[in-house]
Regions:
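C-terminal catalytic/acceptor-binding lobe
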Residues: 133-219
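N-terminal anchoring/stem segment of glycosyltransferases
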Residues: 1-49, 53-59
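A structural signal for short, well-ordered beta-strand segments and their strand-loop junctions
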Residues: 64-65, 90-94, 151-157
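Short, solvent-exposed loop/turn segments at secondary-structure junctions
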Residues: 10-13, 39-41, 69-71, 97-99, ...
Length: 219
């Protein structure tokens, strides 16, 4: 399989975050292509635009995308998601839920798919959008897959450090330091604008993420 792994952050983020993410992927002999962009005033929308850019510019047949504060805990994640998306009709990744709990979707923190699937779904934009379902970055892609009877594989939550968020369909809370399938770790809210998260929590999340990376590197 011709697979590309990507992530995104803004240039004002603590550079150690991208550095440590890269170190973890190096540990597993995997290359992650990190898009580092100048920050804009609309980070949520910018995230979607950069994902669009990654898809347009990528040369690979299969794409796996991580948030900058998301890392694998074991190499097994790679074998697992590659097997899942190799049929060219499966969108696979972390389970997320709309703000009002009306709809589950694949979360932008970690997901993978084939270019064939993306094209067959009409090359949906990854832009964040507002709707009755409080649409998030990858929700439109998820919805198109469902409409066309494609396959969705959700990576389920197996642990979390706190319970900031909630998925009603599974009656499960999760938050900063969430682990999926015992294979993927996502810190959450490490690069949000400070208007969304106080500076102390912002720094705490960064430090916790770096500590987790160090644990993985020593394992």
């Amino acid at each position: 399989m011709n697979v590309g792994i990507y992530s995104f952050c803004t240039s004002d983020l603590n550079p150690n975050i991208a550095l440590y993410q890269n170190k973890v992927f190096n540990k597993f002999n995997l290359k992650i292509n990190q898009y580092i962009e100048e920050p804009t005033d609309d980070l949520h929308q910018q995230h979607g635009r950069v994902i669009n850019k990654i898809i347009e510019q990528s040369k690979e047949d299969y794409i796996i995308i991580f948030d900058i504060d998301c890392i694998p805990l074991k190499y097994d994640f790679y074998k697992k998601i590659c097997e899942q998306i190799s049929d060219n009709r499966t969108l696979s990744g972390a389970r997320g839920s709309s703000g009002n709990g009306m709809r589950d979707y694949i979360h932008a923190g970690f997901f993978g798919f084939s270019k064939i699937l993306y094209t067959e779904c009409g090359s949906p934009s990854m832009d964040y959008f507002n709707s009755e379902y409080s649409g998030d970055t990858i929700q439109r892609f998820t919805d198109e897959c469902i409409k066309l009877n494609k396959n969705i594989i959700y990576w389920e939550i197996t642990n979390a450090l706190d319970n900031v968020f909630y998925i009603p369909s599974k009656n499960v809370h999760f938050g900063h330091g969430t682990i999926y399938e015992n294979l993927i770790y996502h810190q959450f809210q490490i690069s949000c604008p400070l208007k969304f998260i106080n500076s102390d929590k912002h720094i705490e999340n960064q430090n916790t993420f770096i500590k987790k990376c160090e644990e993985v590197l020593l394992s």
